[in-house]
């Protein structure tokens, strides 16, 4: 793709950097390029109803539209969690080797391959989900999560990092521009999980342990699904006119 853009004069490079990572060589190019994927910005075959995406630890993402229909649920790969046994063995083998020895270099390479596999699995899931959203949906609302702040919580730091919510948000942002997806970012203080998607009441007693949302109005719904529906309706709520005072 880069070669074709260079031949067509749609890309002008001005810098390049080379690095070695996980026993592979990587070349990063910097330049000025024309708009990509202009031919794919079509609304044909897309969901026309506004959609919302709730990102989390148990489920990486739940996508639902404003009408309450769940469009997709993606479970996290938990690559780091599943690799803990292999990582412990590789770290132990590395610690037993001598500094500067061939064995240490081989042990470091094995350890690097495990970390590379974890990162690749996480990145692959985020790429697939962001591509689906950018090419299937018309309008998507996601929360403006403070991922860096969330990783400061000792009880959730590893799970949040393993989920890759930051990578998913970044990919959604640039692929939305590529494929013509209209994306909105709801305020991080918007109570999407605590608000009932049926009656609009807010359950201030809801905790992270409550995976099912139960409302006195009779609604019983998965917490993530309820949040995704509320996010799908957020653009209308955020632009709604404030109530006028009653006439004296």
Q: Predicted segments — roles?
A:
Residues 1-20:
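Acidic carboxylate diad motif detector
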Residues 15-248:
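Positively charged, helix-rich recognition surfaces that bind polyanionic ligands
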